[in-house]
Swiss-Prot record:
Cellular component GO terms, alphabetical: cytoplasm
Protein name: Lipoyl synthase
Pathway this chain belongs to: Protein modification; protein lipoylation via endogenous pathway; protein N(6)-(lipoyl)lysine from octanoyl-[acyl-carrier-protein]
Chief subcellular location: cytoplasm
Binding site for [4Fe-4S] cluster 1: 40, 45, 51, 280
Pfam families: LIAS_N, Radical_SAM
Keywords assigned: 4Fe-4S, Cytoplasm, Iron, Iron-sulfur, Metal-binding, S-adenosyl-L-methionine, Transferase
UniProt similarity note: Belongs to the radical SAM superfamily. Lipoyl synthase family.
Length: 298
């Protein structure tokens, strides 16, 4: 079997059953009516049917649908972004009410065209959701916002329940995989977030199957723990289109189980690992587990 056929032919464990019941259809209509975007759709997440139809959860993507970066793994559109929509925070908050969410994830495209990287709108979205949904836990998943400390502080001052920022891949592959992002800058971003708000759990995610070695993965885990990251998610990279980076290898469920055990042994309070795991997959369970472990640690 050639490397090309290896990454084009998905193994059985990556095949999913689509479920488009009334919850899924209703949520899709609501998102369009409120002119909102979800990373579930834009990034072609394989779990969209489970989350929307079964769990009735979604990850909102704010600051528009066009990213200023062109990472070679990502399906989100790139180009010249639209103007900021200052009413977007309230629409997101209203949607959380309508959906009855207990946990919401708010992510965004990278906005390198903005001085604050979109931090002010991000923070206002957190506050709007909190005002209208006081019992909903809030997870934020920002870009590195240019690595500017003040931008991160604006977001952390809004006090989300969890700060998620993905390193995406291992150090050796980072420059090839992540356009305009830096491995060490992401680690610093995570470290600073914990320093600013020590009681807020931090989280990061790694895709596998891009050509990394076992040693690369162990090093990345150690790097995250050295910067006090609490939660790790590990999932299989899937090629969105022929224009994106190819899959070099598919990891088996058994390999993911082993990586999870290794991550937990290194001190992560929670690790979600599996072929279809994505950063926001079962996010409600992750934040609950992290908080329980934080209480036990105290």
């Amino acid at each position: 079997m050639t490397k090309q056929t290896e990454y084009k032919r998905k193994p059985e464990w990556l095949k999913i059953k689509l479920n488009t019941n009334e919850n899924y259809t209703g949520l899709k209509k609501m998102m369009r009516s409120k002119q909102l975007h979800t990373v579930c759709e834009e990034a072609k997440c394989p779990n969209i049917h489970e989350c929307w139809a079964v769990r009735k959860t979604a990850t909102f993507m704010i600051l528009g649908a066009i990213c200023t970066r062109a990472c070679r793994f990502c399906a989100v559109k790139t180009g010249l972004p639209t103007e900021l929509d200052l009413q977007e925070p309230e629409r997101v908050a209203d949607s959380v009410v309508q959906m009855g969410l207990k946990h919401v994830v708010i992510t965004a495209v990278a906005r390198d065209d903005l001085k604050d990287g979109g931090a002010a709108v991000f923070a206002e979205t957190v506050r709007a959701v909190r005002r209208k949904n006081p019992f909903t836990s809030i997870e934020v998943l920002p870009s590195d916002m240019g690595g500017v400390e003040e931008n991160l502080r604006i977001l952390m001052d809004a006090k989300p329940d969890i700060l998620n920022h993905n390193i995406e891949t291992v150090r050796r592959l980072s420059d090839r995989v992540r356009a305009r992002a830096k491995y060490d800058r992401s680690l610093e971003f995570l470290r600073r977030a914990k320093e600013m708000q020590p009681d807020i759990p931090t989280k990061s995610s790694i895709m596998v199957g891009l050509g990394e070695t076992r040693e690369d993965l162990l090093e990345a885990m150690d790097d995250l723990r050295a910067n006090n990251v609490d939660i790790l998610t590990l999932g299989q990279y899937l090629q969105p289109s022929k224009k994106h980076l190819p899959v070099i290898r598919y990891y088996t469920p058994a390999e993911f189980a082993e990586l999870k055990e290794i991550a937990l042994s290194k001190g992560f309070s929670h690790c979600e690992a599996g072929p279809l795991v994505r950063s926001s997959y079962h996010a409600d369970e992750q934040v609950r587990s992290a908080k329980e472990n934080t209480v036990e640690a105290k």
